[in-house]
């Protein structure tokens, strides 16, 4: 009966965090709107080989992540949940692997359940795992690779070893098809310390070629298909998206070596108090085969991405699966021997909640700021934010009431965040970051437009997805669409600022022309270098400018 109660509690936890509140959050630009529109166009066109964004070739990522996202929209429709269904599915599958792997390592059902709950409630896992980007997919394939390699190396017979390495190759191949060749580098770097300490080089060299073969065979069908359709895909994807993004001096998202230290700290909430002990205990027990394996899969990817010049918080998502297992193992030891770390964890959560309550007041309409984050008419959003942090502090306090037994309730600290964050976003943020909000406000003006131009790729993708059309034209800026716009068949999909007046004269009689521009909050739109408009509708950071036929 206790096992049944635990399962019911786990399903309720998943429903409250990963299912029920997802539709209440509008899509964020540029990431979510971009991937939503790519998958919508894939479904609309039936082209499952070449990814397109706004009808243009889009070679920044391979195809597998778009496949999963497209299936999500196909099953659940073109809505907020449908767009995020793929990443939620991948996150839950990763959690299932955490359960299985923990159970296999320690043969303890309670430990396996706790590791799963810790993983799903980690702030970084929840934030990225309910956000429509490709990182939850690559995290799943990397964790699957971690499990496959362990299976292979623990097998006694050649059949088991062969099957494990073949499975490892498939996971690496799917990782390559999701986000590229990093899916090969990370597993190799992660297993080397374990192989070295356990002196298992012989098995690696004898069976490793099976992983190489299955990886190549996994990628080959689509790799050949896109090479035939778009011969320059692999050149662009390898040199620009890998070498330039991660290694060169002009890499995207440049950040210092220590960039991931605050990411690890914030991402470990509400279990931050367990982080030092989990890592220290893992290192102290490094002679234990399973512990050093998990520690290696936590530390090595972190070091790899720290050395790379281009950095984003999402890159290290896969590190938190083995870290959650180490945390759960350490937490049970602490509860049994010395619960100091569990008490510290409770106080950290109380401090975080109280700090959030105070910060919310400071930026509220009743605080000391001259330009508050929320306006007076958004009072209910302030109370939602207070509720988020109040619940965080409350469950932090509750874990201290009988810490040896109540410490797992720290998993409920982000409950308010999960349920209420969609209702607490300030309008000033929504107007710039949620194109759906803008579309809702301007639907009647946008719908009959013959041409729609915008100066932001994220806004363009949001408009395209909301209006179910891929013919949005880029104005003044090309952004990440620069490469796709260079193709001859993309002529007419970009209008520069200098050309706009002439372009307008040529196309005005064809129907309503709508210009959607991103502007600064205090910018005077009358100073924009554009022809006089027939209608202007400003929604704070976004402004709709319309020209009607004369």
UniProtKB/Swiss-Prot annotation:
Keywords: Cell inner membrane, Cell membrane, Glycosyltransferase, Lipid A biosynthesis, Lipid biosynthesis, Lipid metabolism, Lipopolysaccharide biosynthesis, Membrane, Transferase, Transmembrane, Transmembrane helix. The chain crosses the membrane at residues 7-27, 81-101, 111-133, 137-154, 165-185, 204-224, 255-275, 288-308, 315-335, 346-366, 382-402, 406-426. Pathway: Lipopolysaccharide metabolism; 4-amino-4-deoxy-beta-L-arabinose-lipid A biosynthesis. The keyword Acetylation does not apply. Its EC number is 2.4.2.43. GO terms for cellular component: plasma membrane. One of its GO terms (molecular function) is 4-amino-4-deoxy-L-arabinose transferase activity. It catalyses: 4-amino-4-deoxy-alpha-L-arabinopyranosyl di-trans,octa-cis-undecaprenyl phosphate + lipid IVA = lipid IIA + di-trans,octa-cis-undecaprenyl phosphate. It is found in: Cell inner membrane. One of its GO terms (biological process) is lipid A biosynthetic process. Its main location: membrane. InterPro entries: ArnT_tfrase, Glyco_trans_39/83, LipidA_mod_glycosyltrf_83. It is a multi-pass membrane protein. Catalyzes the transfer of the L-Ara4N moiety of the glycolipid undecaprenyl phosphate-alpha-L-Ara4N to lipid A. The modified arabinose is attached to lipid A and is required for resistance to polymyxin and cationic antimicrobial peptides. Belongs to the glycosyltransferase 83 family. This is Undecaprenyl phosphate-alpha-4-amino-4-deoxy-L-arabinose arabinosyl transferase. It comes from Escherichia coli O8 (strain IAI1). The gene is arnT.
């Amino acid at each position: 009966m206790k096992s049944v109660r635990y399962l019911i509690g786990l399903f309720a936890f998943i429903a409250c965090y990963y299912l029920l509140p997802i539709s209440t959050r509008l899509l964020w630009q540029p990431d979510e709107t971009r991937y939503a529109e790519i998958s919508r166009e894939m479904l609309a066109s039936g082209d499952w080989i070449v990814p397109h964004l706004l009808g243009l070739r889009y070679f920044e990522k391979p195809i597998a992540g778009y496949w999963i996202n497209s299936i999500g929209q196909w099953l659940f429709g073109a809505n907020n949940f449908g767009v995020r269904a793929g990443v939620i599915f991948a996150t839950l599958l990763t959690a299932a692997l955490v359960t299985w792997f923990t159970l296999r390592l320690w043969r303890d059902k309670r430990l396996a359940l706790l590791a799963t709950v810790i993983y799903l409630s980690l702030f970084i896992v929840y934030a990225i795992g309910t956000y429509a980007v490709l990182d939850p997919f690559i995290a799943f394939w990397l964790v699957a690779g971690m499990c496959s390699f362990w299976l292979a190396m623990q097998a006694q017979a050649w059949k088991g070893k062969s099957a494990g390495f073949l499975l490892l190759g498939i996971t690496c191949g799917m990782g390559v098809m999701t986000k590229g060749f990093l899916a090969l580098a990370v597993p190799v770097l992660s297993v080397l310390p374990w192989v070295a300490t356990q002196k298992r080089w012989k098995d690696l060299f004898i069976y490793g070629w099976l992983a190489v073969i299955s990886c190549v065979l996994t990628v080959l069908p689509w790799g050949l298909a896109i090479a035939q359709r778009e011969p320059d895909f692999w050149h662009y994807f390898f040199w620009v998206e890998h070498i330039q993004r991660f290694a060169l001096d002009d890499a995207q998202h440049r950040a210092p070596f220590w960039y991931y230290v605050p990411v690890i700290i914030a991402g470990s909430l509400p279990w931050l108090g367990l982080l030092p002990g989990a890592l220290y205990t893992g290192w102290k027990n490094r002679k234990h085969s399973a512990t050093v394996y998990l520690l290696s899969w936590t530390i090595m990817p972190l070091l790899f991405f720290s050395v790379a010049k281009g950095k984003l918080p999402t890159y290290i998502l896969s590190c938190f699966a083995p870290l959650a297992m180490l945390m759960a193992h350490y937490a049970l030891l602490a509860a049994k021997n010395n619960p100091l770390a569990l008490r510290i964890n409770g106080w950290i959560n109380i401090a975080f909640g109280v700090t959030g309550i105070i910060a919310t007041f400071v930026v509220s309409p009743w605080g000391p700021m001259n330009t508050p984050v929320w306006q007076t008419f958004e009072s209910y959003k302030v109370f939602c934010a207070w509720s988020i942090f109040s619940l965080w502090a409350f469950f932090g306090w509750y874990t201290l009431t009988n810490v040896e037994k109540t410490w797992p309730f720290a998993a409920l600290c982000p409950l308010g965040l999960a349920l209420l964050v969609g209702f607490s976003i300030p309008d000033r943020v929504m107007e710039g970051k949620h194109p759906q909000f803008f579309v809702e406000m301007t639907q009647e003006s946008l719908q009959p437009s013959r041409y729609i131009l915008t100066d932001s790729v994220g806004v363009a993708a949001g408009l395209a997805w909301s209006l179910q059309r891929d013919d949005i034209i880029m104005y003044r800026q090309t952004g990440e669409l620069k490469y796709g716009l260079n193709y001859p068949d993309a002529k007419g999909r970009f209008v520069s600022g200098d050309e706009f007046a002439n372009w307008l004269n040529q196309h005005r009689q064809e129907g309503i022309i709508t210009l959607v521009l991103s502007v600064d909050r205090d910018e005077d739109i009358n100073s924009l270098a554009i022809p006089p408009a027939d209608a202007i509708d400003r929604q704070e950071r976004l402004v709709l400018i319309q020209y009607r036929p004369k």
